[in-house]
Curated annotation (Swiss-Prot):
Impact upon substituting residue 173 to A: Abolishes NME7 autophosphorylation
Protein's organism: Homo sapiens
Quaternary assembly: Component of sperm flagellar doublet microtubules. Component of the gamma-tubulin ring complex.
Source taxonomy: Eukaryota, Metazoa, Chordata, Craniata, Vertebrata
GO CC annotation: axonemal A tubule inner sheath; axonemal microtubule; centrosome; ciliary basal body; cilium; cytoplasm; cytosol; extracellular region
One term of GO molecular function: protein kinase activity
Protein name: Nucleoside diphosphate kinase homolog 7
Length: 376
């Protein structure tokens, strides 16, 4: 690999001390994984070229948040023509929608998405109102099956995702297979609709046909104006909170973790991807400050990339789910509770795959923090 090749991005960092947005040039050298930063306003080097293992080429796309030495940077633009040419056409976004009939198979479908080289950049379990369903299916309103389509898409929760990769629209359509699941089982037996769908309407998942449809549909579910889009599905009863930590999301473990939670008999009644900032994480983890020696490392891990928060429902949810997660240290978990989430998916006491609520009285509060306060 060419060690002099570099990609340049314009990045912003919010300085909490000065309450200012500071702008930098971020240079990434894929040959040796090193980074360099220049202060745009003051025209000076902010960080000399330094090897940094936690930033990868696939993290570099406009709109993404990346962590460089504990600073959370938002990539807002390309820094030069070469970077724009090389990386601009490389990544394409599309909408992936898991329909009500396949919600119980969300783990399997997300696993297929990850294995196909997609990055999930947004995710939210939602309940569509009739009006939202009509807006979504506006292209089908002259079709004879239109009313059945609207009825079906509003019968239960859906999961909407923004997914990213080269040629995303075509690749996602290929993974889905033919629109009718019966046809898919004959013509594309390994496709998502063949595996998890029933017929032409109850066909497990959806993907837009064109760049224009993808843009229109993503705007419905994830408005660029900063609005919430359709409502989340949190019920705020008999619940506890689970968060799939950024390292586990980035390692492509989300699908496997969802399958494990379902197979253990828990109901995932709400789910959403969040990019937390340091202030939010410190607020959420406040109960651990001064109590847990790893507090600062826990905070840094939780805002190092996107995490996925869930509302988990079951009787005595906090206690039973905490037992299913296992001891905080995965090494101890592997010896004492080898079937638990942290034993199977955790790496270290900080990167232990999941956070779960510790105290029964905090279950509802933690769920409310994500699904009432942050999803606002």
């Amino acid at each position: 690999m060419n060690h002099s090749e570099r990609f340049v991005f314009i990045a912003e960092w919010y300085d909490p001390n000065a309450s200012l947005l500071r702008r930098y040039e971020l240079l990434f050298y894929p040959g040796d994984g090193s980074v360099e930063m220049h202060d745009v306003k003051n025209h000076r080097t902010f960080l000399k070229r330094t090897k940094y293992d936690n930033l990868h080429l696939e993290d570099l796309f406009i709109g993404n948040k990346v962590n460089v030495f504990s600073r959370q940077l938002v990539l807002i633009d390309y820094g030069d023509q070469y970077t724009a040419r090389q990386l601009g056409s490389r990544k394409e976004k599309t909408l992936a929608l898991i329909k009500p009939d396949a919600i119980s198979k969300a783990g399997e479908i997300i696993e297929i998405i990850n294995k196909a080289g997609f990055t999930i950049t947004k995710l939210k379990m939602m309940m569509l109102s009739r009006k939202e369903a009509l807006d979504f299916h506006v292209d089908h309103q002259s079709r004879p099956f239109f009313n059945e389509l609207i009825q079906f898409i509003t019968t239960g929760p859906i999961i909407a995702m923004e997914i990213l990769r080269d040629d995303a629209i075509c690749e996602w359509k290929r993974l889905l297979g033919p629109a009718n699941s019966g046809v898919a089982r004959t013509d594309a037996s390994e496709s998502i609709r063949a595996l998890f769908g029933t017929d032409g309407i109850r066909n497990a998942a959806h993907g837009p046909d064109s760049f224009a449809s993808a843009a229109r549909e993503m705007e419905l579910f994830f408005p660029s104006s900063g609005g919430c889009g359709p409502a989340n599905t949190a019920k705020f009863t008999n619940c506890t909170c689970c968060i799939v930590k950024p390292h586990a999301v980035s390692e492509g473990l989300l699908g496997k973790i969802l399958m494990a939670i379902r197979d253990a008999g828990f109901e995932i009644s709400a789910m959403q991807m969040f990019n937390m900032d340091r202030v939010n994480v410190e607020e959420f983890y406040e109960v651990y400050k001064g109590v847990v020696t790893e507090y600062h490392d826990m905070v840094t891990e939780m805002y190092s990339g996107p995490c996925v928060a869930m509302e988990i429902q079951q009787n005595n949810a906090t206690k039973t789910f905490r037992e299913f997660c296992g001891p905080a240290d995965p090494e101890i978990a592997r010896h004492l509770r080898p079937g638990t989430l942290r034993a199977i998916f955790g790496k270290t006491k900080i990167q232990n795959a999941v956070h779960c609520t510790d105290l029964p009285e905090d279950g509802l509060l933690e769920v409310q923090y994500f699904f009432k306060i942050l999803d606002n």
